């Protein structure tokens, strides 16, 4: 939450208070990385599920508040192991490649303010869901 507050403060200092309707450009992007626990959790994981759901709710509230002001806020659900190694597990889609996550986050950031993705589910290609 502190990261979001400080990021927003900096975005408004750098780009002003004008809204998109007033002709302002996009000010920036804040991406929250969550897990499947933000949507549902298993028994005996109530506290984990509550903490993940609260991050998702924060992202949704900020998206509603900041979208018109030119700040793109997104919540991603990274449902799988993210590996920074280029190996058989990442090449085959057993694990999520960190580079693929980075490219996806860049794609989110580069979206035009007329259409923004606010939630995105990231899963390894081999995962059964």
Regions found by a protein language model. Name each.
Residues 3-7:
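Hydrophobic positions on the long internal alpha-helix
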Residues 9-54, 59-60, 64-67:
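Catalytic loop of short-chain dehydrogenase/reductase
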Residues 68-129:
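C-terminal helical subdomain
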